[in-house]
């Protein structure tokens, strides 16, 4: 007899915050959401793997997920949880703290795996940071998202986004007011696209290199979803943030287009 799947119920606080995020994104830009998540996955267990291009990303993703009726628990940097007011709200909303570069990262992964296995949708940035790729394409990822999928047994849905970098600069809060004012005036198009689940069933978690191969597939899938969101910007973004550094050590070698 199959055990029925339980689903995490998002706190009212987080549902209200998602509505507020949708309103804020609508004030600062024009949100366009494409693609979707299958009905049987919408409420979990599920891993959403998203490219990271701006400090404004969490707000954009909260809004886009609200449009699609999804209430994800976000794996977020420990800095947010240490903030006096925001930290308390993050904890009460059920989000998961990640202190990068510390031993507690493994504990965060275990917490996230338990959350997914318990019926949650968990949103993770496989790159592990705001990407510094010269063309703003997804970087070579960390293996956390793949290991989370292996540990929980949940499917991974790639999510691509484009446009949030035109709202908040890389070094926010430095330059934040200027960026927000520019966004209110220009109202850039902010696009989010949900893709089809990534095929990982043929990979065995115990096989050497499996997590790295799975990570490559996840990043490839995010890249595939990002391509149609920036058709006129295949090599370099039109909007260039002068405060955003460039780094080539983690450039992801994308597979040739089919």
List PLM regions with ranges.
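Helix-to-loop junction immediately C-terminal to a conserved catalytic motif
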Residues: 14, 21-52
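Short gly/ser/thr-rich secondary-structure transition/capping motifs
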Residues: 27-34, 103-106, 174-177
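Catalytic core of membrane glycerolipid acyltransferases/transacylases, capturing the structured
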Residues: 40-102
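Hydrophobic/aromatic ligand-binding patch that stacks against planar heteroaromatic rings
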Residues: 64, 89, 114, 147-151
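Catalytic-site beta-strand/loop segments enriched in glycine and acidic/polar residues
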Residues: 115-146
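A cross-family acyltransferase "interaction/gating" segment
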Residues: 135-206, 239-242
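Short, highly charged C-terminal tails/helix-capping segments
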Residues: 230-255
């Amino acid at each position: 007899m199959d055990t029925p799947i339980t689903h995490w119920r998002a706190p009212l606080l987080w549902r209200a915050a998602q509505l507020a995020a949708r309103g804020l994104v609508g004030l600062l830009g024009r949100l366009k959401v494409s693609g979707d998540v299958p009905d049987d996955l919408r409420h979990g267990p599920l891993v959403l793997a998203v490219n990271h291009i701006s400090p404004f990303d969490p707000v954009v993703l909260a809004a886009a997920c609200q449009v699609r009726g999804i209430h994800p628990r976000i794996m977020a940097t420990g800095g947010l949880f240490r903030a006096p007011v925001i930290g308390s709200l993050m904890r009460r909303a059920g989000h998961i703290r990640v202190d990068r570069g510390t031993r507690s990262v493994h504990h965060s992964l275990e917490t996230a795996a338990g959350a997914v296995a318990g019926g949650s949708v968990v949103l993770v940035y496989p790159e592990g940071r705001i990407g510094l790729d010269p063309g703003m394409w997804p970087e070579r990822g960390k293996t956390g998202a793949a290991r989370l999928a292996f540990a929980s047994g949940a499917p991974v849905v790639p999510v691509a986004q484009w446009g949030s970098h035109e709202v908040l600069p890389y070094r926010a809060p430095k330059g934040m007011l200027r960026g927000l004012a520019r966004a209110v005036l220009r109202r850039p198009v902010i696009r989010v696209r949900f893709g089809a689940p990534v095929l990982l069933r043929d990979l065995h978690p115990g096989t050497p290199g499996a997590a790295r191969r799975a990570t490559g597939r996840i990043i490839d899938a995010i890249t595939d979803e990002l391509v149609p969101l920036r058709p006129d910007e295949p090599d370099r973004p039109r909007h260039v943030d002068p405060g955003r550094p460039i780094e080539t050590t983690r450039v992801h070698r994308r597979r040739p287009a089919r």
